[in-house]
From Swiss-Prot:
PROSITE patterns: TBC_RABGAP. GO terms for biological process: vesicle-mediated transport. One of its GO terms (molecular function) is GTPase activator activity. Keywords: Phosphoprotein. Residues 504-693 form the Rab-GAP TBC domain. The keyword Nucleus does not apply. The keyword Transport does not apply. This is TBC domain-containing protein C4G8.04.
Amino acid sequence: MQPSVSDSSVYLSSAPTKPIASGSVATGIDSMPSKVDITPCDLLENSKSSAPLFVECNQESLHSIPGSLHLVPDASIERLIEKHGAVNLLRQLAKDVAERDSFISDLKFHFESREYVFRELLREHGLDPVLANTKLSQRHSASFFPSSQEPSIPENPSSLTGEKPHLYARIDSAINEPFTPSDRLSPSSLVPLLKLPALDHAVSSSSSSDLPSDPNSASYIASSKQKASSLKLTSSLKKFYSWTSSSSLQHTRENLHDSTSSLRDHDPSLLSSSKFFRSSPRCSTPSVSSTFVSATSEPEVETYSVSTKNSSSNKNLRSSLSKLLSTSNLNNKPLSLSSTAPSMPSIGSVELGNMIPKETQPPSMRNDWKDYLDNNSKEILDQFGFLQKRPSHDTPLCPEDIKLNQKQTLSFYESNYGLVDDFFGNELDGLNDSPLLLNKKDILLDMKESTRQKNWSLFFQRLYKKYKITDEDTIGLLGISSIGVKGRHGKKRWHKFRELVKNGVPLCYKAKVWLECSGAYQLHSPGYYEELLSRTDEVESASVAQIDMDINRTMAKNVFFGGKGPGIPKLRRILVAYSRHNPHIGYCQGMNVIGAFLLLLYASEEDAFYMLMSIIENVLPPKYFTPDLMTSRADQLVLKSFVKESLPEIYSHLELLGVDLDAISFHWFLSVYTDTLPTNISFRIFDMLFCDGYVCLFRVALTILKSLKQQILACNSSSAIYSFLSDLVQYSFQPDSFIKEAADRWSKLVTEKSIERKRNLAISSLNLAVNY
């Protein structure tokens, strides 16, 4: 039916589209048209037509009802309902909406596919998509506001609120009101993790005119009625800007970053994208996101603020630690250095990761693994779920034994968290015995971790300011390809990044930093991992049988694995998927501990799979895990050559006792030190591995031998040396000094060129030995 003159007088022509098979929306989504491939020729051809938006090929188009009924008078709509019926009219409108949605979806898919191809072309030619995004955003902003003119704002707010001033007052209050999770979630179901007394003080000290009032209070309603006639939108926006940029808020943020926050309970998937951390125009410190956890996971905790802004102020830190560790503040409640804030200004969006069931989350994302052990157990769980021997907590008999017991416990934390006893000075006399310290084992870790996070946040903030990266740019966390090569200060910026890596990557950033620095970010292909797991037409090879034999004995002292842990099925799927991805290599012993080590950090097994793929194919030298293990065997000869040059005393002692260093170091290299050293040092080694490359393996081996020089020279038999160097997990290395020595001491001796030269000679000698 063609519309009458009265009905069609307001009919608006829309953009043309391809003919799409019609279907009734009322019958369900199964009748929706399938996606079609749209080409630029189709768009150009359709643009020449003057037909309405949805053109039908069949005779039904003659009886279609126009889709612009919202513009016709009420009388015309009533006549249409009387003539065609409400059901038919509604069905026709629903069909129009469905066809419009289908066309827009196809168009969006078409241009997204083109954009993906262009990005891949840029990467293949060595160009950075970040710079392209930056220039495009600048051009779009310039074309959107010609001649540097900003959009005009109506002087009369009633034009926006429909002549209803009371609505404008509420809109103005909503604009200024800071976002709190309690707006959407009931307070009884959530316990805030961060508590900021300084924030409450700063907000209360501000003038009442600068802060939004409670909409439910009587004073708010009265003041809204009085001010409604004189409110201006421009003044309200300026007021909001001045409030967010005020000195009180700046002081609040400085206090927030000076106080040490507990990162142990944070979900890394919520805080892993630091590009969403933004600051106000007048505040240079990074913003901090408040995270809320379930009330059933942990009761409300007592909080204290420990200042770490100035590293030289050890006096305040000692006194704060004494207060933290005193029995008077225990009260049988878990203690945390974090602070809680029930309300804080909105600081921008936060990237949400995949929803991982709690039972399959790794220990680094959970804080309740400690419930698996009794309080009287002789073992404790570290941050990553490994069982460790509990320091002696027998009651000392004399003051000398008390001090010795305190030093023993602090030595335990020094080896695990990188803090030294000298830092506390004479404050050892004010601390309690080791059981209390063990109950507060997160304190020392939180202090160093919060300092690292602050330094990394500042680095990210400056990096994004340099390249003008916005929330819409999907270039990952670092944009690693442009850190050291772009700009006049690129080299300096790269050295700054490497210094941060040497000091340790914070746990909340570690997952994404590893993905980008290792190259796994670029290897990711949606659906490929599921495709590998779904292959059923292949005959199970010997690799799968070997995987089933090895996974049950992988990381036996970790609660996440240990033969029957929740990580075992995930590890098996990762190893089987890689054996199908690279059948030439298949599976080799050493991959199991590397994959398990990655699953301690990555809740998504797909991310862990691509990390394993990148380590084997990008980070380590070629043919490292091939069946003949030629490259990995040659590297042991290279290491022996470096030991002979740099540590001649140790080399002579090993030769005198007939110790074959290859038999010890071969497992170090093949497992990438994942089950050789303490877990916290292994994570730091991976930080350096993805920054410096495989040269890190040789530098770490030389650092181990040099650090244990006295113990090695004290061994009088080869069996003693084999026994000592084969299990270094419980040895007390100092993480910071160990990593810095491995990164800097051997940087001139152990280089890629020297390794390649020695490796080629070693491979030649091994080939000659095989031929003979």
